[in-house]
Amino acid sequence: MEHILDCRMGWDPADLAYVSSRIVNGDLVVLPTDTVYGIGVRADNHDSVRALLAAKGRNETMPPPVLLASVEQAYEVSTDLSTDAIRLMESFWPGALTVIVQANPSVDWDLGQTGGTVALRMPAHEAVCELLSSVGPMAVTSANLTGQPPATNVEEARGYFSGTVDCYVDSGPTKSGVPSTIIDCAHGDATLLREGAWALKDIATVLGYQPGTR
C-alpha cells in the first residue's frame, strides 16, 4: 500500500514521525527538494544505499550525494573544508549547489566509489530540512531511472518507482526542475562538474576566480 504524505502547508507532526520512522528503519522514500524530486535513504545505512542504487539502475561507480539540514553538519562529515568550499556553502546554501569535499574517514558511510570524497548539499526546502533534522543526513539522488528525465512531481516519481517505493512526500510540483550545479572542492582549486541552477559566472563571483571545468 502506497503512503503519500502532503507537506505543502508544513508537516503534520504525525506525518513527519511516520516518514522519519520509515527512513530510520531503512526504507526508500521519495521526497521533494528545491530542484527536482529525489529518492533517498539514511546515509549511514549501507544496505539501504545499495537498494537506492539498485532502484535507480546504478552501481557503486555513481555514488549519491548527501543532503544536510545545515551548513554546520558539513563540518561534521568533512575533515578538511577548503576556503572555497566554505565560501560556496555560506553563499549558496540553502540552495541548488552541490559541493564535493574530502570525507571524514570516521563517518561510517558506504556510498560507493567516492575516492574519499562526499558530495554535499543543503536544499532550500523548509519541510525537507526539518525531515533531515529529524533523521540525519540522507543519501538522495534524483527520482528517476538512470537516463530518464527527473521527476518534478509525485506522480512522475510514482511512474518510476511504483512497486519499489511505497512512501512518498508530496509538496506539489517543484519550482524549477533544474538540477543543482556541482562543484568539486576536494582537489585544490574549484572545478565545475555540472552547470545547473547556478551559472559558472555566479560561482566565479563568489570565489574571485574562474573555476576550471571538466
Region locations from a protein language model:
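Active-site-adjacent structural elements in enzyme catalytic cores
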Residues: M1-R214
